[in-house]
Amino acid sequence: MASEQEILSGLAEIVNEETGLPTDSVLADKSFTDDLDIDSLSMMTIVVNAEEKFSVRIPDEDVKNLRTVGDAVAYISQAQG
């Protein structure tokens, strides 16, 4: 099971691969849409990659609740537990 810091780091790598954003700009308090300018298509790719990387399932209806990077970290952390 990954720690929250490992999840954050892993998500930053996934976001970087999808968007080209530097990993150090992917912080827990950043909004996927407002701060990182991630559209819904990119978000779905990020979710799929996160599911694979962390061996979790993130149902589509839950994705809309993942507004910030921190929301996603907490969700993945809980889903692993």
Curated annotation (Swiss-Prot):
Keywords for this protein: Cytoplasm, Fatty acid biosynthesis, Fatty acid metabolism, Lipid biosynthesis, Lipid metabolism, Phosphopantetheine, Phosphoprotein
Domain of life (superkingdom): Bacteria
Signal peptide location: none
One Pfam entry name: PP-binding
Domain Carrier: 2-80
Keyword Ribosomal protein assigned: no
Any one GO biological process: lipid A biosynthetic process
InterPro entries: ACP (IPR003231), ACP-like_sf (IPR036736), PP-bd_ACP (IPR009081)
Gene Ontology molecular function, alphabetical: acyl binding; acyl carrier activity
Modified residues (O-(pantetheine 4'-phosphoryl)serine): S40
Modification after translation, per record: 4'-phosphopantetheine is transferred from CoA to a specific serine of apo-ACP by AcpS. This modification is essential for activity because fatty acids are bound in thioester linkage to the sulfhydryl of the prosthetic group.
Gene Ontology CC terms, in alphabetical order: cytosol; membrane
Associated pathway: Lipid metabolism; fatty acid biosynthesis
Compartments where located: Cytoplasm
SUPFAM superfamilies on file: ACP-like (SSF47336)
UniProt record similarity statement: Belongs to the acyl carrier protein (ACP) family.
Job of this protein: Carrier of the growing fatty acid chain in fatty acid biosynthesis.
Name of the protein described by the UniProt record: Acyl carrier protein
Source lineage: Bacteria, Bacillati, Actinomycetota, Actinomycetes, Kineosporiales
